[in-house]
Each structure stands twice: as structure tokens, then as C-alpha cells.
Amino acid sequence: MNKVRTRYAPSPTGYLHIGGARTALFCYLFAKHYNGTFVFRLEDTDVKRNVADGERSQLENLKWLGIIPDESPLNPNEKYGKYRQSEKLERYRQIANELVQKGLAYKSYDTSEELEMQHSEAEKNGIASFRYDKNWLKISEEEKQKRDKAGEYSIRFSMPKDVVYEWDDIVRGKISFDSNDIGDWVIQKSDGYPTYNFAVVVDDFDMEITHVLRGEEHITNTPRQLSIYNALGWKAPEFGHLTVITNMEGKKLSKRDTSLKQFIEDYKNDGYDPHAIFNFLSLLGWTSADNSEVMTHDEIIAKFEPSRLSKSPSKFDIKKMQWFSKQYIKNMDNESIINKLNLNNDEWTNLFVDTFKQSVFALKQLLVEKENYDKPSETAPSLTQADLEVVLSFKNEFQNKDFTISQIQEAIDQVAFKTGKKGKNLFMPIRLATTYIEHGPELAKSIYLFGKDIILKRLSQWN
């Protein structure tokens, strides 16, 4: 295999989405598995839809995930030209004009109103699938020259007849399209900007991209792109089209669905572990040969085989992602967590983090738990008679103990022995009476973290 070069080429029209992150990750894994180069470039020609912060969000969140481009607008290789489409408009115009000069493309002088009329006529004639007819427009040579001089034209590629565009898709196998089903299409708009299907070919050729992994919505774009490669005598990259990501009900993820956070920045701000998301996303449409789940960055790269990319839609299971994050957070060292949360690195905080990191999937949850200790509740819970008996037994044992974690645990064990209670029937009454919280991590530590004075005060009210 020649030197592998893959690319992730988003538009800065929004922030890094789950789907975009998954695509970027698979492109990255493909390149790294074959010791190749992963390129980030920007398709920023849709000026009206561009978000000012879009490029920064994409690059910063990719970096946070551990998906580091070898080349980007911030780290370009001059050999391959510009990494933002807006900076290479002259290059696209040069290639478009070359196609015109070769008779493979032509200037189209239709106004938007005239195109609409052509659409309407086609519908009236019962033509369901509209194809542009370059002979439809009847204007004088004088009018044509006038529009030409004013730059009032687009450039259309002349689709060849009776050609089958076929490729061996990395994910799906053989796919083919008949050129007769595709009309002449615009490669350069009347404002001088290239269309996506044209610019992406020029970019991939200029950057010597060898493999393209992208969403399945691009399958129908591929024959148009192949037609440009053929016309210019350029070698096309290999294509692979990833399946969609759905919610748990099987519906394609929609950015309008507010029931699920869909941007990487949201999970970053909540304090999810970045490698947990890297790990989770890698399994969203791919499985390792040994069916491993929790894997290191390098293990995923080593095990990534494109032949194991799924042909079926992948369900985004937020609970599974939370499980992954939980595995990584509980194995983080306390100091790293304390620094990330900007907390004081003292003995109490270390014990708090060590206790509660076992049961959270996002670091922000630790701050919520810490509120219970920073601002202890004054409202005591209500207890059943059975619960009260357990609490009074604990109160009696506790009064004769030193205030240490081991002694608190010994008091709990003695209550279990004397009352015969165990599990929920033992722990929940004691937890409610001492911490005022129904659920939590290791009970003895949870009690100890409140301090002796608060615990004695709370126990004193139970008689």
C-alpha cells in the first residue's frame, strides 16, 4: 500500500458533532493503523452559514479527544497548498476553466428564475426526476454576451453518456451508478465559488488523499466526483461510506433533538473523560477482532481493521458512554481530578475525590456531590420505625468509637451483627440519618467526610 493519507474536512458551520467526531476518529485510526498521515482541512466556502468560532471548536475539541491532525490550517505542509477552501478560489477557477477549454464543461447563463421555469415545465410534462437541459434556454447571442461580460453565469460539467461509475466501497463493497441518471451539474456558481462536489475533488487531488471515509449521505455524490477525476485524468482515492448513527429508537440523530447532547463540547464541559469518548466512538460502527471494549489509544490504533467497519446503523447509547467514562474516571489519580476541578489539594479533598470518583461518569458530578458537604442540609429525612431501630443501634455503637473511618465501619458491622440487617436494609437507614442522602459511595467514608460535629448533631435528634 502506498503512503496512506486520509482527511477530515468539516464546514465551520457549527461545533463538533458526535457524527463528525466519529468520522474524524475513523479517518484518524485508518491513517495511524497504516502509519499514514491524517489531514484536517476546512470547507469554508459557504460564507453565509459559517460560524465565527467553528474552526476553533473543531480543532480544539478534536485535540481534547486525542485526535491530532498531522496537517491542518495551523500546521500546513506547503507542498499540498492551502488548507482552507476560501484561500484557494483561484485554483478552483483555474481547473473549471480548464474543463471549459477542453469542452468538458460549459458556461450556463440561466438565471434562477429561468431555472425555476425549466423545473416547472419538467413537472408539467410528468418528469419526476429533473435533469438540466442545456438546450432549454433560448436567448440571443447579444444577451448571452451581456450576461457573460457581467459574470452572470455558472459553469456546468457535461456528464458523459452511457458511463457506469463503479467503486469498491471500503465499507459496503461494490457500488455503481449510471451516468445517464445524472444531469449536467454546476461546478462553479455564479458568484465564482466552487460547489462541494467539484472543490472536494480538487482538494483531495492536491493533497494526495488516498482514502476517503465519510457518511453514507455522500454515496450519491461519489459518481459526480468520479466523473471529474476521469475528465482530468486524475487517480481517484478509495472511498468508504460509514453508516448513520441513530438514537436508541433507531431514528437518525438530529441536531434538533434536544433530549440528547450531541456536541463534543457539551461532554467536555460536563467533565467526561476524553479517552472514554474516544474509546466509545471507536466502537460506534466498528468492532475489534477480539471484541475488546476498554482499550488504550494505541491498542485501538493497532486493532483497527477497516474490514470490520459495520454495514448496519450504530445506536448512540448514552448509558454505554457513561459506563466508559466511569471506568476511566475511577482509574484517574486524585491529583489530576483535583487540578481539573481547581480544588484545594488537601487531605480532605483527596479523601473526598478518592471516595466519590468510584461512582461518577463526569467530573462535574463531583462538584454536585461536594455541595452536600460544603453546604450541609438542615432538613432531616423521615424514617420508618424499622429504619429508626437500625439508626438507634448505630447511634449507640457510634458513641463508643473514635471518629475514624475504620471505627465508623466497625460500628456499622456491629449493627449488622446485632440486628441481623444487611444490604439496603442496613445501609440506607444509617446513610439517611447521617448524610441526609439516600444513595452514595462507601458509607463509612461518606460519614467521615462530614466531620464529627455534624454527624453527632444529626444523630442526636434520633431517639
UniProtKB/Swiss-Prot annotation:
It is an enzyme of class 6 (ligase). It comes from the Bacteria. ATP binds at K255. Belongs to the class-I aminoacyl-tRNA synthetase family. Glutamate--tRNA ligase type 1 subfamily. The keyword Protein biosynthesis applies. Monomer. SUPFAM superfamilies: An anticodon-binding domain of class I aminoacyl-tRNA synthetases (SSF48163), Nucleotidylyl transferase (SSF52374). The keyword Protein biosynthesis applies. It is found in: Cytoplasm. CDD domains: GluRS_core. This is Glutamate--tRNA ligase. GO terms for molecular function: ATP binding; glutamate-tRNA ligase activity; tRNA binding; zinc ion binding. Keywords: Aminoacyl-tRNA synthetase, ATP-binding, Cytoplasm, Ligase, Nucleotide-binding, Protein biosynthesis. GO terms for cellular component: cytosol. A motif ('HIGH' region) lies at residues 10-20. InterPro entries: aa-tRNA-synth_I_cd-bd (IPR045462), aa-tRNA-synth_I_codon-bd_sub2 (IPR020751), aa-tRNA-synth_I_CS (IPR001412), aa_tRNA-synth_I_cd-bd_sf (IPR008925), Glu-tRNA-ligase_bac/mito (IPR004527), Glu/Gln-tRNA-synth (IPR000924), Glu/Gln-tRNA-synth_Ib_cat-dom (IPR020058), GluQ/Sye (IPR049940). Its EC number is 6.1.1.17. One of its GO terms (biological process) is glutamyl-tRNA aminoacylation. A motif ('KMSKS' region) lies at residues 252-256. Its main location: cytoplasm. Catalyzes the attachment of glutamate to tRNA(Glu) in a two-step reaction: glutamate is first activated by ATP to form Glu-AMP and then transferred to the acceptor end of tRNA(Glu). It catalyses: tRNA(Glu) + L-glutamate + ATP = L-glutamyl-tRNA(Glu) + AMP + diphosphate.
